[in-house]
A protein has these predicted regions:
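Intrinsically disordered, low-complexity proline/glycine-rich segments
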Residues: 1-84
């Protein structure tokens, strides 16, 4: 699942701050893992806290919430990195 060449973010995917995606509340399964949406949580070891995903909202939506894609940001500014 991609938008403009960017792969969807799934539970367990990493961030450029060394963190990872903790939750993925959509019912969409991409290559065996749930896809993450706006508001799903990440953990940032640099900031030592959990932060919500804040996608740009230009891609597909699930029940009104935008999916997160490679390069989207978290509330602390970390970039999401897809494993797809």
């Amino acid at each position: 699942m991609k938008h403009e060449g960017r792969g969807v973010i799934r539970v367990g995917d990493k961030t450029d701050h060394g963190g990872k995606v903790l939750t993925a509340t959509s019912t969409t399964i991409a290559m065996g893992k749930a896809a993450a949406l706006k508001g799903d949580m990440t953990y940032c070891p640099q900031c030592k806290a959990a932060f919500a995903i804040q996608p740009d909202g230009k891609g597909a939506k699930h029940q009104g919430k935008p999916y997160a894609y490679d390069g989207d940001l978290t509330e602390c500014g970390a970039k999401l990195i897809t494993s797809l």
